[in-house]
Swiss-Prot record:
Keywords: Carbohydrate metabolism, Cytoplasm, Hydrolase, Magnesium, Metal-binding. It is found in: Cytoplasm. The keyword Metal-binding applies. Substrate binds at residues 118-121, 211, 244, 262-264, 274. PANTHER family: FRUCTOSE-1,6-BISPHOSPHATASE-RELATED, SEDOHEPTULOSE-1,7-BISPHOSPHATASE, CHLOROPLASTIC. Binds 2 magnesium ions per subunit. Mg(2+) 1 binds at residues 92, 115, 117. This is Fructose-1,6-bisphosphatase class 1 1. It catalyses: beta-D-fructose 1,6-bisphosphate + H2O = beta-D-fructose 6-phosphate + phosphate. GO terms for cellular component: cytosol. Pathway: Carbohydrate biosynthesis; gluconeogenesis. NCBIfam families: PRK09293.1-1.
Length: 332
């Protein structure tokens, strides 16, 4: 029987891609793997462990937090705080970034941004959710506390990014700038194994993912693009199929494997869209580009946007290159 490579082996094997690396990034990816396992275990038994429902408080964006948003955040923060690979962390569920200034963190090279639980509206109804992470090398001097500047870096500075998808199976997908690979969790063994190597968007896609309930609020260009995808044109395989789960990770994963486009545009009610640039758009954009796809805000490359605030939002269009460029044409 063919033996699959474990995530741990793959991380070590690929450490050579980073001639300057001293193993910190590998150790950090392993910490994220560990936290992911713990969150996965909690999600699998959520209905029994009284961790469904609301936490009774709001995050900095005024969204009412789900108990699992809070728990997943605590698991990632405590796992990464207990291991010395990062000097700071920012999260969707925390108003401000955390500075890890204990001795073992002071000289750490990296910072992490996370969306601990993506697709929160789906938790209580057992639909696929995820965790998204983005890793940067610090800008501030080693030995000093992490600064806001360390977090407000453009997406092109990411050294690694990825997500965990908690679906029919649990898969960890990530890139370090050398392609995108996916590892499926085998609960029987308790390890992640390489199951999707060097993932690339298929040449063509015919699935579009957008919350059409917001159609009336969309800019004209997006309205026209949606009309275009729904028109009959057998040659161009239109109308496209509509698939929207309410979880960015799930829609992105499907579109990357089968071809498609995800759109969360700006609108009258959300002038800058809904998704957060630093821990949703940038990591997915890095993965998309590494898989041969594209990610824009309708006209500009997401990864070239200069962030101004920790929780700022950005219009997000991401998927097959050709499909994103068509949407951009309509936006022009
Ligand atoms: O319900 P809406 O407005 O369509 O938004 C759904 C989108 O918002 C998100 O749930 C935002 O992420 P969080 O759940 O992490 O807040 C995305 O996963 C999803 O694609
Ligand atoms: Mg999210
Ligand atoms: Mg979230």
């Amino acid at each position: 029987m063919e033996r699959h490579t474990t995530l741990g082996e793959f991380i070590i094997e690929n450490q050579k891609d980073f001639p300057y690396a001293k193993g910190e990034l590998s150790a950090l990816l392993s910490s994220i793997r560990l936290a992911g396992k713990v969150v996965n275990q909690q999600i699998n038994k959520a209905g029994l462990a009284e961790i469904l429902g609301k936490a009774g408080k709001e995050n900095v964006q005024g969204e009412s937090q789900a108990k699992l948003d809070v728990l997943a955040n605590e698991i990632f923060v405590s796992t990464l705080r207990n291991r010395g690979e990062i000097c700071g962390l920012a999260s969707e569920e925390l108003e401000d970034y955390l500075v890890f200034d204990e001795e073992m963190h002071k000289n750490a090279e990296y910072i992490v941004l996370i969306d601990p639980l993506d697709g929160s509206s789906n938790i209580d109804v057992d639909i696929t959710v995820g965790t998204i992470f983005s890793i940067y090398r610090r800008i501030s001097k080693k030995g000093t506390p992490a600064t806001l500047e360390d977090f407000l870096q453009p997406g092109i500075n990411q050294v690694a990014a990825g997500y965990l998808i908690y679906g029919t199976s649990t898969i960890l997908v990530y890139t370090t700038g050398n392609g995108v690979n996916g590892f499926t969790f085998d609960p029987g063994i308790g390890s992640f194994f390489l199951s999707h190597s060097d993932i690339k968007f298929p040449k063509k896609g015919n699935t579009y993912s957008v919350n059409e309930g917001n159609y009336v609020h969309f800019p004209q260009g997006i309205k026209k693009y949606i009309k275009w995808v729904q028109e009959l044109n057998e040659e161009e395989n239109r109308p496209f199929t509509s698939r929207y789960t309410g979880s960015l990770v799930a829609d992105f994963h499907r579109n990357m494997l089968l071809g498609g486009i995800y759109l969360y545009p700006q609108g009258t009610t959300a002038p800058k869209g809904k998704l957060r640039l630093l821990y949703e758009c940038n990591p997915m954009a890095f993965l998309a580009e590494q898989a041969g796809g594209k990610a824009t805000d309708g006209s500009r490359r997401i990864m070239e946007l200069q962030p101004q605030e920790l929780h700022e939002r950005a219009p997000f269009i991401c998927g097959n290159k050709e499909m994103v460029e068509k949407a951009e044409e309509f936006m022009q």
